[in-house]
């Protein structure tokens, strides 16, 4: 019952049941609010639960090795001192040489994106097409929303359970798709 997978499922249930509701309410706010009226209002599901999910997405985007390099650099720079979300993302960028400027929107934009996934398989051409789109509904604090950077991990299997290598235009591609447009 205490397995990693079961814990992950429980965390996702908390996110969907509580944090998504907070993100859709008049209390919606970004992970990194511009201002805090009352310090107790800062400790919310958005700051902690959604913030943790954003860090998991950075891990998915960068991969284990680059994420660990980023963590090491972050601790070297900020151990024992106050640090910000921007400090964390900067360490990840510097360690991996990956531009995360688009990804930073997760910290400044409130709301939960609605992700739509459509798939189609053509048996004649043996081609599988995946179409992913996103939109984030307006929130009281932000009427206009920008598309977020969503790393989308995917793996396909054949009838025998073997991994099918992903290709785009006949060339191998990474199993993490980067959704950056609406």
Describe the residue ranges of each PLM region:
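Hydrophobic alpha-helical and helix-loop surface patches within well-folded domains
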Residues: 1-119, 124, 130
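Beta-strand-rich binding/interaction modules
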Residues: 99-102, 110-182
